[in-house]
Amino acid sequence: AEYGNRLNLSFEDMDRIVTQGKELGIYLYFFTGGEPLVRKDDIIRLCEKHDDCGFHAFTNGTLIDEKFCQEMKRVGNFSVAISLEGFDEVNDLRRGKGVFDKVMHAMDLKKQYGLIFGTSICYTSKNYKVVTSDEFLDMIIEKGARFSWYFHYMPVGNDASTELLLDPDQREYMYHRIREIRAMKGGKPIFA
């Protein structure tokens, strides 16, 4: 994918935001939107300069490689949540052909380097049972994920599909299922 620079902040702007944030007592920063790891060199510089802060990015995972994992381990204050929407076929349908395999490789690298990471899961009317199934959760836990962010699908824009929205029964299912996953007794060893 190609990403434009029109709306990107310069390193100096990001540094200024963090510096001002620290003056206000803010020490945790999130990178979202587009693909933050197209700026991974600047993010690592920011982590180095502000080693008293924590940084977290929501990423599609396709730009995670061994060198980047080494840099993350070196700075020690940067974590990622890798977007995942189901097993290979379902994930690739929404994220692009071959993305599931790239995400699995990224997770393997994260685990190999002992890095804390998690998943970012957008659940829809089509995938909500799969992404909360024991089989799926066991897979991401086996891969090394320590946490999972769950976001419900929200159509944006004039052409956005509303068929992926959950109906009331599906929303209620998710409400209860997430609490089961979080439960101390019989729950999964992952923070959801």
Question: What residue ranges belong to the model's regions?
Answer:
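Canonical Radical SAM [4Fe-4S] cluster-binding loop centered on the CxxxCxxC motif
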Residues: A1-F11
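A short acidic, helix-capping loop that chelates divalent metal ions and anchors anionic groups
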Residues: E2-G4, D88-R94, V156-T162
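Short, conserved sequence motifs enriched in acidic/basic residues, glycine, and aromatics
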Residues: R6-N8, L63, L165
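Radical SAM/AdoMet-radical enzyme domain recognition
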Residues: F11-F31, R39-H152
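A C-terminal junction/extension of Radical SAM enzymes
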Residues: Y153-A192
